Amino acid sequence: MKLLIVFGLLTSVYCIHKECSIQECCENQPYQIEDPCPIHYYSDWFIKIGSRKSARLVQLCEGDYGKRIPIHYEMFGNYTISCEPLEINCQAPPVGSLIVRCSYDYDFVEHHDVRVVLDFI
């Protein structure tokens, strides 16, 4: 229990210094993630593998907006259920962290990333 409290505090401190969204979901149940991007912004979802700024981003959905479909990777199992809106199987990402890239432009020339932390209930 103490470890869980310490982890929660560390996550909160991390989120204060970086853009972060904490969301609650029931473990191993379908969960529709709330999009933390501002209204009228495009969002694209990734798993960030590694902790460095230059870490690899693995895209979770593909296709044009309005017709996006999940990309299923063997290493992630059935993590992504649907894309518009993003629905996942509520569990910690198999590797790395869940990231949403927000951009006002369709081509994501200028963007900012938001880390999404799932709190399991």
From Swiss-Prot:
CDD domains tied to this protein: ORF8-Ig_bat_SARS-CoV_HKU3-1_type-III-like
Keywords: Disulfide bond, Signal
Protein origin, superkingdom: Viruses
Native species: Bat coronavirus 279/2005 (BtCoV)
Matches recorded under Pfam families: bCoV_NS8 (PF12093)
Cystines in this chain: 25-90, 37-102, 61-83
Protein name: Non-structural protein 8
Additional remarks: This protein corresponds nearly to the fused 8a and 8b proteins of SARS-CoV. Bat coronavirus 279/2005 is highly similar to SARS-CoV (SARS-like).
Signal peptide limits: 1-15
Residues in SARS ORF8 Ig-like domain copies: 19-121
